[in-house]
From Swiss-Prot:
An individual GO BP term: histidyl-tRNA aminoacylation
Protein name: ATP phosphoribosyltransferase regulatory subunit
Keywords noted in UniProt: Amino-acid biosynthesis, Cytoplasm, Histidine biosynthesis
Main location: cytoplasm
Compositionally biased intervals (Low complexity): 339-349
Family named by the database record: Belongs to the class-II aminoacyl-tRNA synthetase family. HisZ subfamily.
The keyword Amino-acid biosynthesis appears for this protein: yes
Length: 349
């Protein structure tokens, strides 16, 4: 019997669902354009060395690679579009003066699945602001994300803001033993205050810094900024990340962004993000519908150093949120992996 099934983690999108994704992408690009972002189209394949240059070590396992028959080069199917944007920006300074505002959409393919039911091929639309740093650029990305979520019609969208270096400064000041650092970051990702306290007790830093480590698990919700200020007074290295976060929030609020939450104990994207981070949420979505942040170290890897910030919207999760809000089911699910198959995945964007 002819087997017409798809590989694990992949799926077909039928006309109605495809139309929803196309409509979402069109609405997003309408907002991107109004903010001055210009669209680029990028190839599905890149040389492996270019792709690897732009990924965090944890993301390298997501790369699907093979030898190109014609040239013999090792190439990769893109697992992330941001490194491609960085490569383009570095390769074409004549066409892309700084700062450059670029937007895109398209699929990315990951070798792994992060959890059962999550597709390996993800459809995204996003923006990158290259060559601009500071609170004004941070706020621009934050406002653009909020406006994008509103434009596509999500009900009660919410943006959550953090900073990659706040928790990092506290962990460094606590001087945890090397063998405990990974476990401490994992505990922070689970908001496990007890495990953080146990790790901090073995630190060699000041008592103030060690006491601050378990408090990182509670830096969200009402009063989060007040609690963060108290930590920053005890851990001087945390003061600058907090100030950067508050500066961006002040500008964004002046520009009308209201539904913003804070989580300064965010552990996502360690080693990739260098400043403010953010995520977009909406009722009915299985996870964040958008992720992004500042990644000032990336452009230098491609030979054109400079600050950069951006985000990507997961069109599938956004569609899922809209369909559930309107009572139209649960969206399209991929073929699940077998017990021997992969896991489902997403990158820290």
């Amino acid at each position: 019997m002819l087997d017409l099934s798809l590989p694990s983690g992949l799926r077909d999108l039928l006309p109605d669902h495809s139309a929803h994704l196309a409509e979402l992408s069109s609405k997003l690009h309408d907002v991107f354009s109004r903010f001055g972002y210009r669209r680029v189209f990028l190839p599905t394949l890149e040389r492996l060395d270019v792709v690897e240059r732009g990924l965090s070590p944890a993301a390298l396992a997501d790369v699907m690679k093979f030898v190109e028959p014609g040239s013999g080069e090792v190439v990769a199917i893109r697992p992330d579009i941001t490194p491609q944007i960085a490569r383009l920006y570095a390769a074409r300074p004549d066409a892309l003066p700084s700062p450059a505002r670029l937007c895109y959409d398209g699929p990315v393919l990951r070798a792994r699945e992060a959890r059962a039911g999550r597709p390996r091929e993800v459809y995204q639309a996003g923006v990158e602001l290259l060559g601009a740093g500071g609170a004004s650029a941070d706020a621009e990305a934050l406002v653009l994300l909020a406006r994008s979520l509103e434009r596509v019609g999500l009900k009660a969208p919410r943006v959550e803001v953090g900073h990659a270096r706040f928790a990092e400064a506290v962990m460094e000041a606590a001087r945890l033993p090397q063998r405990l650092r990974s476990a401490a970051w994992e505990a922070l990702s689970r908001k496990d205050r007890a495990a953080l306290g146990a790790a901090a007790a073995k630190g060699r830093g000041s008592s103030e810094a060690r006491e601050a480590v378990p408090q990182l698990a509670g830096l969200f919700g009402d009063g989060a900024l007040d609690r963060a200020r108290a930590i920053a007074r005890a851990v001087p290295g945390a003061a600058a990340p907090l100030a950067e976060t508050e500066a961006a929030l002040r500008i964004a609020r002046r520009r009308g962004v209201r539904e913003v939450a804070v989580d300064l104990g965010e552990a996502r994207g360690l080693g990739y993000y260098t400043g403010i981070t953010f995520a977009g949420y909406a009722p009915g979505a299985g996870a964040a519908v958008a992720r992004g942040g500042r990644y000032d170290g990336l452009l230098a890897r491609f030979g054109r150093p400079g600050p950069a910030i951006g985000f990507a919207v997961d069109l599938e999760f956004a569609t899922q949120a809209l369909e559930r809000a309107n009572g139209r089911g649960r969206g399209v699910r991929p073929r699940r992996a077998s017990a021997r198959g992969g896991r489902a995945g997403t990158r820290p964007r």
